[in-house]
């Protein structure tokens, strides 16, 4: 008989342990983890991982999740690695969250359950229903619902089950594929200074903030001009721009660049009319390429119309749409827009015959009619009673009764109904009613406030980081800590891949091919080769350089240092923003780490100890000026050298030459079209030869003789 090493529930503390994978993975909630009996045999064979303070959600107001797509990916990869390592040691893994007295326990708890449920769906083949039952089976206190990013009391609470069903539908329709996902790229483009956009349906619908006529910074938020997005949109085949807010830029800037532009304005914080919704659905249906949708912040109005098209095209429910939207772009769909989507759910389904909803709806309606006809004589007008059998088939109220605390005193409990029910759409004695369409005292609309909050939180996250010392381990072992590896990837079987470095300092999957560039000289940054070989996945260097200029850039260090050629492949992918733009002039990252200095030594054969990267200066004989504009070249050609990069490696460079050199001047030729480099002083020139012909008459012969002598 096999010995059961499952961690037992300790009677000395109030906790719950939920078995997700038999004898492998558990989910726990510990009010006091120090009370665990470490001498217990089952505890010694268990690896405890504290999820508190590992990831942080940047709220707009009182919203707290779900955690975005990058956090979901990193946690799933880490869980897979932990299970693989601990299974070889016959140890179990318990991911737990604890009540640290900060009031965030319920929020962290439901976010952890969401990530573990998504892991079961993505990697273990669970359905969303089974995954939800797994994570909630051992919980005595039900999960709270996710609220929106509005200022007032929530009008709707998003159910954990709806979020998991949104993940399941995204996996089904190909929107989610962690075997080809770049979380660093996702986090880069999500930042306000780098464009502030996210793919909702990869390759089809992109959500971004509203551009302005010119790039500027206002109230801490950087606004972008339309031309900032041109390169990225062209590279990712975005052909149509839909504007939902007031005109803050000239639409001709997009149309002159070859994009289609559509205006569908409605008030910030409000819901669209049926006419606007139908026009938007028609625009998306008739567009062959991608559609970039924006309002002011790209959250409320943008997410609402995108959800309407998703319900029409794929037959998703309103809750599933909101769940997936907030995973991709946190803060989407706000205030009254939530009950609006629930109200328009069946209407959106009826707009398409290909979403698979109609056949099920018709059969269900006929079945209900027959049932009503057969039971019409048994209708009871008295008090409604639910039989135990029918109660098993109904969805339980999974959200607990919360007690509002004001001034240290508990008031009447407020029942929070599960999302998707009529009770959840009715606010029970709201403490604060806010009109999301109204302007505040400073004249800011909902979008203005959200933009400033997002910029503020992202700026604060740069200066503060989670306390890594808060992670608690109860059993000493060599198991890796709960830190996200920068070199973790997944293959097509959704298994983590660890790229091991070789003796020469590069990864085992190093490729010798050149960097692929776009026609304008930018680097195409990919993740997979065309053959699907995942061993060529790029290893993270840790020295990526982020820079904002006149376009959207994402520059890996391999583009700055030629010896670290990128191992990104040439296959087009659509699971995240896929073609980052590289600036025309390389920008360097000042680094003082030993690995950075070691790489500089390997790049500089002379052994320079300076941390400033050097550049090769060619010998320039003449610089021609032409009227036509040519795209700048990435590498300046050396006189007398071939195009092969191998010849450049043989050049020994000690230090860059100053240009122009000492004693050299640049003179414009008579034709006015070119420059010549000449010495500063002409040799063998008679003194006074350069004076004017009438100098003697002006100065006098005596003075001139004295001057020349």
Swiss-Prot record:
<feature type="region of interest" description="Disordered">
    <location>
        <begin position="573"/>
        <end position="594"/>
    </location>
</feature>
<dbReference type="GO" id="GO:0005730">
    <property type="term" value="C:nucleolus"/>
</dbReference>
<dbReference type="InterPro" id="IPR016130">
    <property type="entry name" value="Tyr_Pase_AS"/>
</dbReference>
<feature type="region of interest" description="Disordered">
    <location>
        <begin position="628"/>
        <end position="661"/>
    </location>
</feature>
<dbReference type="GO" id="GO:1903452">
    <property type="term" value="P:positive regulation of G1 to G0 transition"/>
</dbReference>
<dbReference type="Pfam" id="PF22785">
    <property type="entry name" value="Tc-R-P"/>
</dbReference>
<feature type="active site" description="Phosphocysteine intermediate">
    <location>
        <position position="295"/>
    </location>
</feature>
<dbReference type="Pfam" id="PF14671">
    <property type="entry name" value="DSPn"/>
</dbReference>
<dbReference type="GO" id="GO:0040038">
    <property type="term" value="P:polar body extrusion after meiotic divisions"/>
</dbReference>
<feature type="compositionally biased region" description="Polar residues">
    <location>
        <begin position="480"/>
        <end position="490"/>
    </location>
</feature>
<protein>
    <recommendedName>
        <fullName>Tyrosine-protein phosphatase cdc-14</fullName>
        <ecNumber>3.1.3.48</ecNumber>
    </recommendedName>
</protein>
<feature type="compositionally biased region" description="Polar residues">
    <location>
        <begin position="639"/>
        <end position="649"/>
    </location>
</feature>
<dbReference type="InterPro" id="IPR044506">
    <property type="entry name" value="CDC14_C"/>
</dbReference>
<dbReference type="InterPro" id="IPR029021">
    <property type="entry name" value="Prot-tyrosine_phosphatase-like"/>
</dbReference>
<dbReference type="GO" id="GO:0030496">
    <property type="term" value="C:midbody"/>
</dbReference>
<feature type="domain" description="Tyrosine-protein phosphatase">
    <location>
        <begin position="196"/>
        <end position="354"/>
    </location>
</feature>
<comment type="function">
    <text>Protein phosphatase that negatively regulates the G1-to-S phase transition to inhibit the cell cycle and establish quiescence in cells of multiple lineages including vulval, hypodermal and intestinal. Promotes nuclear accumulation and activity of the cyclin-dependent kinase inhibitor cki-1 which leads to inhibition of G1 progression during vulval tissue development. Has been shown to not be required for cytokinesis.</text>
</comment>
<feature type="short sequence motif" description="Nuclear export signal">
    <location>
        <begin position="372"/>
        <end position="381"/>
    </location>
</feature>
<feature type="compositionally biased region" description="Polar residues">
    <location>
        <begin position="501"/>
        <end position="521"/>
    </location>
</feature>
<dbReference type="GO" id="GO:0005813">
    <property type="term" value="C:centrosome"/>
</dbReference>
<dbReference type="GO" id="GO:0005819">
    <property type="term" value="C:spindle"/>
</dbReference>
<dbReference type="GO" id="GO:0000922">
    <property type="term" value="C:spindle pole"/>
</dbReference>
<keyword id="KW-0131">Cell cycle</keyword>
<dbReference type="InterPro" id="IPR000387">
    <property type="entry name" value="Tyr_Pase_dom"/>
</dbReference>
<keyword id="KW-0132">Cell division</keyword>
<comment type="similarity">
    <text>Belongs to the protein-tyrosine phosphatase family. Non-receptor class CDC14 subfamily.</text>
</comment>
<dbReference type="GO" id="GO:0000281">
    <property type="term" value="P:mitotic cytokinesis"/>
</dbReference>
<dbReference type="GO" id="GO:1902807">
    <property type="term" value="P:negative regulation of cell cycle G1/S phase transition"/>
</dbReference>
<dbReference type="GO" id="GO:0045786">
    <property type="term" value="P:negative regulation of cell cycle"/>
</dbReference>
<feature type="short sequence motif" description="Nuclear localization signal">
    <location>
        <begin position="366"/>
        <end position="371"/>
    </location>
</feature>
<dbReference type="GO" id="GO:0040028">
    <property type="term" value="P:regulation of vulval development"/>
</dbReference>
<dbReference type="GO" id="GO:0004722">
    <property type="term" value="F:protein serine/threonine phosphatase activity"/>
</dbReference>
<dbReference type="GO" id="GO:0051256">
    <property type="term" value="P:mitotic spindle midzone assembly"/>
</dbReference>
<dbReference type="GO" id="GO:0051233">
    <property type="term" value="C:spindle midzone"/>
</dbReference>
<dbReference type="InterPro" id="IPR020422">
    <property type="entry name" value="TYR_PHOSPHATASE_DUAL_dom"/>
</dbReference>
<dbReference type="GO" id="GO:0005737">
    <property type="term" value="C:cytoplasm"/>
</dbReference>
<keyword id="KW-0963">Cytoplasm</keyword>
<feature type="compositionally biased region" description="Polar residues">
    <location>
        <begin position="404"/>
        <end position="413"/>
    </location>
</feature>
<dbReference type="GO" id="GO:0000226">
    <property type="term" value="P:microtubule cytoskeleton organization"/>
</dbReference>
<dbReference type="GO" id="GO:0016791">
    <property type="term" value="F:phosphatase activity"/>
</dbReference>
<dbReference type="GO" id="GO:0005634">
    <property type="term" value="C:nucleus"/>
</dbReference>
<feature type="compositionally biased region" description="Low complexity">
    <location>
        <begin position="463"/>
        <end position="479"/>
    </location>
</feature>
